[in-house]
Amino acid sequence: MFEALYAGLFNGLIYAAVAVGLALIWGITDVINFAHGEFLMLAMYAAYWFFTLGHVDPTLSAPLVAILLGFVGFLTYALIIKRLQKGPPMAIILATFGLGLVLRQLAFIAFTPDYRNLPDTMVSGSVTLAGISIGRPQVVTGLIALLMVIALFILVYRTRWGHALQAVAEDREVAALVGISPDRVNAQVWMLGSAAVGLAGALLTTFFYVFPSVGTVFGLLAFVAVCMGGFGSLPGAFIAGILIGIIEAMTGYFVAPALKTVSVFILFILVLWYRPRGLFGRW
């Protein structure tokens, strides 16, 4: 049981890292990026090809992949989101959803539907924690994801720049009056949120298969975590992501692996039934 609990905890840290990137974009810019899972897929393919062609381990290429995905996030904002912001909200929803479909289909064409995985990486093997053996890739990825989330929290809640983000999230017009550019902040947030999912995606390749639709499940779970934690709440998304990982692991251990995702959605429905704004949402 404790082995499953540990696995769920470290998987939950990865879910949390992906969810926090989505929550950051949603909370500051008031836009739901339905292509978030496909951004993770791009990051996984980037790390895979860095390893295959350049022999660069994903743990080492992760910062570069994060930068690349940050640029993808900037382009998405500059070319799509910015142009649609003054239109109906449904236009942006459909645009990001359509972008996800396009990216997934392009991946099918370019890389085929084959499942790919990396052989031995620098974090391959297992470690023993309190007498329980667990895969080293999951531990390393989970810990790096935790450090990344802590760094994001410090940036958002403990720096001047973070205060500017919160000001834009609270009231764009007032923020503009005091010299804060909402447009610049939005672009930076899209870059940062996309870089976060890029880092998580690169690290995932150390133990997870890479295929065109890999981002679908992770994107969906990130969306569930953000909604469950409280719309746009970074601490809420973080805690909900960990909770999802643990619930999945415990369901797989005590009930059946096939019901892992079902249990997450049952919990999701119960949380929103009791607290419609999520665990940390404002009433």
Q: How should these model regions be labeled?
A:
Residues A110, D114, E170-L177, S181-R184, ...:
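Cytosolic-side transmembrane-helix boundaries in multi-pass membrane proteins
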Residues H55-L99, L106, I239-I244, R275-P276:
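Alpha-helical transmembrane segments within multi-pass membrane transporters and channels
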Residues M1-V18, A46, D57-S61, G87-I92, ...:
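Membrane-interfacial amphipathic/re-entrant helices at transmembrane-helix boundaries
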Residues R83-L84, P88-R158, V185-Q188, M250, ...:
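Transmembrane helix-bundle core of multi-pass membrane transporters
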Residues N11, S133-F211, L234-I239:
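Helix-loop-helix "hairpin" substructures at the membrane interface of multi-pass membrane proteins
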Residues A23, G27, A47-T52, L69, ...:
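Structural signal for membrane-spanning alpha-helices in multi-pass inner-membrane proteins
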Residues F2-T52, L79-K86, A91, V226-L234:
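Single transmembrane alpha-helix segments in multi-pass membrane proteins
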